[in-house]
């Protein structure tokens, strides 16, 4: 039984930045530091930050006056920003810069009176934040998840229409939805570069290659992690058995029956320590080796807010 490690896997630059923002805020300003929603979708990461004094809340009403609040990597609506501003809360924004790029696309469309179609998953925090960037009462923003949704979609002005997408979607499925939008609305425009982020693309590419060579794929990630779920779905489409697991304790030994080649990857919010835990468990159960696959080098870094770059001296 051999282990094959996908490359790249795990943390992306946006997740690294978001976690660093919370860590630096805790170091510089001391607990409690409030965070709206899970800063990233991973219980291991969130629990570690809680232990250090981060307090995770669903809405700003739970944040006391004169407090520091951090917006999660998934981004927030303009209404949330306005609420924080009106209350005078000190805000550090951990929104991934690639999500902010999509926000700006929606704001530009809104300012021009162009209607917007967002490809994304209903209820995901990133989608809620992106939808909340559109405020033109004469236009509209519409959410679609599938080609079937496009078939049912009716807009006010098909000649002034723009599409964008959640950054963590299936590359293949999103391409199908974009094709359907262009077929139904020939005048629709979109971003010059796909909104799906580099890390999502790279991790899906590595899983596409790995799944063809493995009997089973284990994806380390949270159940509410969009990009982790897309990795599992992609492996299954290719024909591999795939399981999304939070950590090594979730692996069921019967999954590995007759498996000679086991692939392991991790979603963009899953730390490498969890991957290593999976490798160690598989070796306990008889795996002979763990081989790192070649893959695309990722050297992107996103800067944290200036106020958090150097520890303040009192």
Curated annotation (Swiss-Prot):
Residues that, per the record, bind dimethylallyl diphosphate: 41, 74, 124, 225-227, 269
Name of the protein described by the UniProt record: 4-hydroxy-3-methylbut-2-enyl diphosphate reductase
NCBIfam families membership: ispH_lytB (TIGR00216), PRK01045.1-2 (NF002188), PRK01045.1-4 (NF002190)
Chain positions recorded as isopentenyl diphosphate binding sites: 41, 74, 124, 225-227, 269
Location of the active site: 126 (proton donor)
Cofactor(s) listed in the protein's UniProt record: [4Fe-4S] cluster
Organism of derivation: Pseudoalteromonas atlantica (strain T6c / ATCC BAA-1087)
Example GO molecular function: 4-hydroxy-3-methylbut-2-enyl diphosphate reductase activity
Record field: catalytic activity: isopentenyl diphosphate + 2 oxidized [2Fe-2S]-[ferredoxin] + H2O = (2E)-4-hydroxy-3-methylbut-2-enyl diphosphate + 2 reduced [2Fe-2S]-[ferredoxin] + 2 H(+); dimethylallyl diphosphate + 2 oxidized [2Fe-2S]-[ferredoxin] + H2O = (2E)-4-hydroxy-3-methylbut-2-enyl diphosphate + 2 reduced [2Fe-2S]-[ferredoxin] + 2 H(+)
């Amino acid at each position: 039984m051999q282990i094959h490690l996908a490359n790249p896997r795990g943390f992306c630059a946006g997740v690294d930045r978001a976690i660093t923002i919370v860590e630096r805020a805790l170091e510089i300003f001391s607990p409690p530091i409030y965070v709206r929603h899970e800063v990233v979708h991973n219980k291991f990461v969130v629990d570690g930050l809680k232990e250090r004094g981060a307090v995770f809340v669903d809405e700003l009403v739970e944040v006391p006056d004169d407090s520091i609040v951090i917006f999660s990597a998934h981004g927030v609506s303009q209404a949330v920003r306005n609420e924080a501003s009106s209350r005078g809360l000190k805000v550090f924004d951990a929104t991934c810069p690639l999500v902010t790029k999509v926000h700006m696309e929606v704001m530009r469309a809104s300012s021009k009176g162009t209607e917007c179609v967002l490809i994304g998953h209903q209820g995901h925090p990133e989608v809620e934040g992106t939808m909340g960037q559109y405020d033109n009462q004469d236009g509209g923003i519409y959410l679609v998840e599938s080609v079937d949704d496009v078939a049912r979609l009716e807009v006010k002005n098909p000649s002034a229409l723009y599409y964008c997408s959640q950054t963590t979607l299936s590359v293949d499925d999103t391409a199908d939805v974009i094709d359907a939008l262009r077929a139904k609305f020939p005048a629709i425009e979109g971003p010059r570069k796909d909104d799906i982020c580099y890390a999502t693309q790279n991790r899906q590419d590595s899983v596409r290659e790995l799944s063809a060579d493995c009997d089973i794929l284990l994806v380390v990630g949270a159940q509410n992690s969009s990009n982790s779920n897309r990795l599992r779905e992609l492996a299954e489409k290719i024909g591999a058995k795939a399981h999304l697991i939070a950590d090594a304790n979730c692996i069921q030994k019967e999954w590995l029956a007759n498996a000679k080649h086991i692939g392991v990857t991790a979603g963009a919010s899953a730390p490498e320590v969890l991957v290593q835990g999976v490798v160690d468990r598989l070796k306990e159960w008889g795996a002979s080796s763990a081989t790192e696959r070649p893959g695309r080098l990722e050297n992107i870094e996103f800067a944290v807010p200036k106020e958090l770059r150097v520890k303040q001296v009192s």
